[in-house]
């Protein structure tokens, strides 16, 4: 992108610029000109899309800090696309769903690369300041984040690269496809990793086989090496000295005391298969350790004891798994927890399902609405409507805790989007099923992989509502424990296995292929073999879950729920649209108020009618047919006199249509004064006699009246009088 030339007088501005070719795009990384007070700042550009990434770190950790406070904020500025924000205040408000998801996308691959024990606060702010409509800025933001961290001096085991991958059978894999290219792609995958390892995968696909998905991951990792190399070269020229930071030394004496006093008891506790009982016992042991070891005389803090206690937990669980011993809940590495599936569990909703897998449970509800219920998304690339929504809720009671209730959190938004990715490939096309669909997953119990339970529940609830899905979908979460002496891939991981393991690998799909894949890896050295094994085990588990789901409901119900809105579509002449809408929308408003129906009209004359019941639907159809009806010669209509003139009367016989009853067509006898026969507002029956080239309609009352008796009797004699 062409930027302004700095003033020659400003000697302090000495930007360092690195350009490199990335597939078909030229990427520019610039530092030293903007945001110079941040620990590290890079302006990353790809084509005309630019993201300013500023990284700031605290030199000291807060006292008592026991977690790594990393925060990532991705924000899209309206001015980047030449737009002014809507709303009363006309400025950017709370983060959109896209901004939240991209923030998580950036956070996930960089978080494991900070050294263990590093607890200093780090903040990453990515601001989209210039945007092309056809380019997603997320990859640019990830590249910029990698570069900003690399030059910041903050301890970081990077750099990372990032790539988006598309796929078509004709073209194979596509590097960093545009929005328009993705419309025809069977895959949308984002991969991030270092020079040696893949760290993060986020994808949705149209039922692709496992080998294509794995190939896409490997292709992305190979291509992103251009980014890793370029960032490393930028760091050579512009990086600040790395902070002189060292992790706190482990208290060897305290560690030995914790291990000697509690390792055996912790090992026994991890044989308790019931989650709550296990947690209660571990809590007792943890409190006992703190009480015995964190005393004033010892000078040891409770946090130190708890930290070492957690390390013992991790060590015990991991060593058992790698050794092939039974897992925490007694299963082997490939067994899925017991399943229980119900549909139609709520009487008044459109579709519902209760999906239970072990101690993870989701109550999922589907709701159908009209086209106007679709979500309006005001994005940088333009406004669009989304007819499908999947919302995920994770109340604190699902894990037996008290907690904050309120605004939707980042985690809930991320899990909802993952579940949506899993379902998206099997949804019907809008022209085949013109309803707006909303799915809500209420996590009522949680012990691992609630997002994949949401996928299963969403598939069941949509089929229960009668939504014509192409195929049922199921999801499963895989885990990994890797030690020097071996590794184990775990099917259907528990929450503890997710926390204590090295990988969270979630796969959703149908019997024919993968629809979504998400992978987060906490260590380096995940090989192609490990990923292949994980995908294979995931497929076996997915097919097992699908078989259990199919026993309850194998295909969508033939009829929509009686609680769902009725739908009817009809086609009219586009010139008639104004008649249905009426002046200032008065006509269509009256139809909706009288019938209770919701009406959407396309510019091509297609009318979509939604109603809560059949009566409202039929009433709305009848009104529209009346308004759009054309006069037919010879047809008889019930009309109302709207105006009387010297030469006849104008009669309204169809909505918006008036015709003339000429004075000669009012009665068989000669009419001298129209007012003697007709009054304004009078209801009469008329017959359509003719429509001239200008569309004027001639009506008759006389044609519907019986002929006079005298005229009828004298007619034969009168034939020969002349």
UniProtKB/Swiss-Prot annotation:
GO terms for biological process: mRNA catabolic process; RNA processing. Residues 565-624 form the KH domain. It catalyses: RNA(n+1) + phosphate = RNA(n) + a ribonucleoside 5'-diphosphate. It is found in: Cytoplasm. InterPro entries: ExoRNase_PH_dom1, ExoRNase_PH_dom2, ExoRNase_PH_dom2_sf, KH_dom, KH_dom_type_1, KH_dom_type_1_sf, NA-bd_OB-fold, PNPase. It holds the Pfam family KH_1. Component of the RNA degradosome, which is a multiprotein complex involved in RNA processing and mRNA degradation. This is Polyribonucleotide nucleotidyltransferase. The gene is pnp.
